[in-house]
Amino acid sequence: MINNHPIREKPKHIIFNLLSLIFFLIFLSTVVSSQSPSYTTHKTQRLTETKTIPELIIADLNLTILKVNLASSNFSDLQTRLFPNLTHYERCAFEDCLGLLDDTISDLETAVSDLRSSSLEFNDISMLLTNVMTYQDTCLDGFSTSDNENNNDMTYELPENLKEIILDISNNLSNSLHMLQVISRKKPSPKSSEVDVEYPSWLSENDQRLLEAPVQETNYNLSVAIDGTGNFTTINDAVFAAPNMSETRFIIYIKGGEYFENVELPKKKTMIMFIGDGIGKTVIKANRSRIDGWSTFQTPTVGVKGKGYIAKDISFVNSAGPAKAQAVAFRSGSDHSAFYRCEFDGYQDTLYVHSAKQFYRECDIYGTIDFIFGNAAVVFQNSSLYARKPNPGHKIAFTAQSRNQSDQPTGISILNCRILAAPDLIPVKENFKAYLGRPWRKYSRTVIIKSFIDDLIHPAGWLEGKKDFALETLYYGEYMNEGPGANMAKRVTWPGFRRIENQTEATQFTVGPFIDGSTWLNSTGIPFSLGF
């Protein structure tokens, strides 16, 4: 065990001023944090006599930014002092927190700017605040002993006062998110006559053409070829050469071949598009895993943060294998990211839909345990989900969604998909129990709609997490599915399980309402339907 060092003392007058501001603004924000509608409405009316709720939220977020800067400074100081004695995993955990705190400041500044804008979009701001709450959860996960039971390289315990700062940031964000819900107005769901469209509106006409066109007809900006016939031989070099903070599409063509590298697209690499030669032809492969000392957040073969990322005709593979525990093939925290005809190949934790709004069309996802997980608002449409053969004695869970508050507009929606056994599981599927999902956090939300569910799924359908955790607060729903595994006669009887019986309830999880697909998918060029 590494000794815990005290956090460096700050000048007393700075602490006094900061605490004064904190107590004042926390008082304002907690006034509207009650879950009682009548109480909230009454207090909101009183507060808006002097300040509008957006102004209160801005004040709360500016306070939160101060706290994030304090947390970042303390994490950095602590990392510097402890670095020689930290394990590789512990260094990863510190790096994750510092990076996520930087992302937190970036997203909060965007939210403040948006709240001051005349074209205020409450849905976008709700998503930003939810993203930031997810960053705090991810930071603390890295230091959680319960999440690191696969090996013994987590010997350092984060000081309680630093944990409290992160939790306090989350509480502030929770208050802000709830205040936002008080004044936001949901857009009406599209009518059935309006949803049968080919593309969502957040994809531009140019991006639509890019996705429809064969690669030889695509005007790409850079090319990568392992045989030396492109601009670069590695994907990382091409990403480094791409512009920062681009507002227009930047296309990187990755010629067929196997590329053995871990690729990270930071937040500044926006509007990047990867185009390959097809599943199994353009393959990006690596093998980082939790067992080998990497944090789950750093295991991805490809990780993306910059907004507007698109991938087409590529295989993303983590080849660590079933014995290596968490080993992510792809991680997306890219808002308005979209994937078309891609493959995600791994075992445990294959596809990390970490945060923001995402869309997957005609993709193949392979895995064993929790192989689609995270807290994005994500829709899988016309895709195939394959359970692979796990280690002996393990149970298969297709999803592990991590929504942490009822106000968060996140969840996993599986629409018009196929839920199947992979070829290696088919001969032995009677030896393993497979489930549609299990809860990662208290308000976990996953729905299966108009999909084919094969006979590998256990009649109960869904798997408990730890004992009775989240069984009353989760939202797991099924609607108009087909196949031998779709029979709900013996499904779980948890309070949070829904046998969805009307189209209105199911419609809220389609592309239009759930990820605001009408506002951004058109620009990606990926075919989609806003409704069923």
Curated annotation (Swiss-Prot):
Coiled-coil annotated residue ranges, if any: none
UniProt note on tissues of expression: Expressed in siliques but not in flower buds.
Location of the region described as Pectinesterase inhibitor 39 in the Swiss-Prot/TrEMBL record: 35-169
Main localization of the protein described in the UniProt heading: secreted
Keywords: Aspartyl esterase, Cell wall, Cell wall biogenesis/degradation, Glycoprotein, Hydrolase, Secreted, Signal
Signal peptide: 1-34
Top EC category: hydrolase
SMART domains assigned to the protein according to its UniProt record, in alphabetical order: PMEI
Glycosylated sites: N62, N74, N85, N172, N221, N231, N244, N287, N382, N404, N502, N522
Described purpose of this protein according to its UniProt entry: Acts in the modification of cell walls via demethylesterification of cell wall pectin.
Protein name (database record): Probable pectinesterase/pectinesterase inhibitor 39
Gene field: PME39
